[in-house]
A protein has these predicted regions:
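Flexible, glycine/charged-enriched surface loops at secondary-structure junctions
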Residues: 1, 36-38, 105-123, 154-155, ...
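Conserved structured catalytic cores and adjacent interaction surfaces
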Residues: 285-289, 293-379
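Glycine-rich, flexible beta-strand/loop modules in the N-terminal catalytic cores of phosphate-handling
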Residues: 1, 7, 14, 73, ...
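Extended amphipathic alpha-helical scaffolds
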Residues: 121-263
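Stable alpha-helical structural segments in soluble proteins, enriched in small hydrophobic residues
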Residues: 19-31, 94, 101-105, 170, ...
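Conserved phosphate/anionic-ligand binding catalytic regions in large, soluble enzymes, centered on
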Residues: 14-33, 223-247, 328-350
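Mobile "lid/hinge" segments at catalytic clefts and subdomain interfaces of large enzymes
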Residues: 32-151, 343-379
Length: 379
């Protein structure tokens, strides 16, 4: 599915991102393409202690909160936020109010669909072969459990390779003329089996693959001043995830000029994120930044922005670069922690240290019950 969203005209008081989100939802909803929408989006600000839905440009400049919420009629599907140390209660209330507004927009979209929407086309199911899955589950469950049960990702991957090889050897005897379709189906069944094992550990035993509790973080380590010629540097390690962030200071003339659809503006605090192939054991060439690098860089930049001193207090341009040395989940959050270390090492008088951590949510089938976990890692 390809959606083309083109900004034809801009009203400074109306966010083009929200308009594009709702427009995309309408386009999919009235088409014959099956999907689980519609969804709607809204921007929430906090101005003078009151929540403002889709604030004007002037209100956004005063707002303590920049929150974008996308949701269906029943559930939230996406949250993006930046805030000047807003309380947990205020953030929760803002999300709930945003969902109420989105529900009204979804009703509006449904009324459009009722008038001009096309019937959704039918397509063949891509579910795994149930009989084959049951055979694999019976044969390989114990081996998969033993392979997954370790806190070392490399060891886990090596064990799983052995299990996969054994499964293919065993079922190669049952299906001697194994087609490409059968190979793909066995791989899909093995993935489904791993998912089933992990979900049962989480939901039934509150156990994670590395043995941690749901609220337990991996071992932490932090170092500063690792690089002798940089203005500041910080290495943050959480489990097998490791990020090295450097801080470079320059004259205010080094700030970045932003020339987008809004008025020209300057950015004196910049954060860039790089994740080379070696961090995940891949041999790949270094190209320009992709969506991951741009998105993670912006996320970590936004996390530190509220604590950066004003230009009157600290008249310098600040550039941070986070290099992912080793990745096993939560590299964006590690780059936030590394950025705090590098800024303090460079002598930047930030208002408060900032840390980041990833959180996950898992729900029970056909139930509203759920469990949350902190510090997600790769499996």
């Amino acid at each position: 599915v390809c959606l083309s969203l083109t900004v034809m005209s801009v009203d400074p008081d109306c966010s083009p991102e929200i308009t594009a989100m709702i427009g995309a939802s309408i386009a999919l909803s009235i088409s014959d393409i099956p999907w689980n929408g519609p969804i709607a989006g809204v921007f929430v600000g906090l101005v003078d202690g009151k929540f403002v839905m889709n604030p004007t440009r002037e209100e956004r400049e005063k707002s303590l909160l920049e929150l974008t919420v996308a949701s269906s009629e029943k559930k939230v599907v996406m949250i993006e936020a930046g805030a000047k140390e807003v309380s947990d209660d205020d953030m929760y209330e803002a999300i709930m109010k945003a969902h109420e507004v989105n529900c009204e927009t979804v009703k509006f979209i449904n009324s459009i669909v009722a008038e001009i929407g096309k019937p959704k086309f039918e397509y063949p199911s891509c579910d795994v072969d149930h009989d084959l899955f049951e055979q694999i589950r019976e044969y390989a469950t114990d081996a998969v459990k033993a392979a997954l049960d370790t806190d070392d990702k490399k060891v886990r991957d090596d064990r799983l390779q052995v299990v996969y090889a054994d499964v293919f050897e065993h079922f190669g005897e049952i299906y001697p003329e194994m087609s490409d379709e059968t190979v793909a189906m066995i791989n899909e069944c093995m993935y489904k089996l791993q998912k089933l094992v992990v979900r049962r550990w989480l939901l039934d035993e509150q156990k994670r693959v590395d043995g941690r509790r749901m609220d337990q973080m991996r071992p932490l380590n932090a170092e500063v001043s690792l690089l002798p010629r940089t203005h500041g540097s910080g290495m943050f390690t959480r489990g097998q995830t490791q990020v090295l962030t450097t801080a470079t200071l320059g004259p205010i003339s080094d700030q970045q000029l932003l020339d987008g659809i809004d008025d020209q503006e300057y950015k004196r605090y910049m954060h860039h994120y790089n994740m080379p192939g070696y961090s995940v054991g891949e041999a790949k060439s270094s190209r320009g930044p992709g969506r991951r690098e741009i998105g993670h860089g912006a996320l970590a930049e936004r996390a530190l922005e509220p604590v950066i001193p004003s230009v009157e207090e600290f008249p310098y341009a600040i550039r941070l670069v986070s290099e992912v040395i080793s990745s096993n989940g939560s590299t964006s959050q590690a780059s936030i922690c590394g950025s705090t270390l590098a800024l303090m090492d460079a002598g930047v008088p930030i208002k408060a240290p900032v840390a980041g951590i990833s959180c996950g949510l898992i729900t029970k089938p056909d139930s509203d019950e759920f469990l949350t976990m902190v510090d997600i890692q790769g499996v």
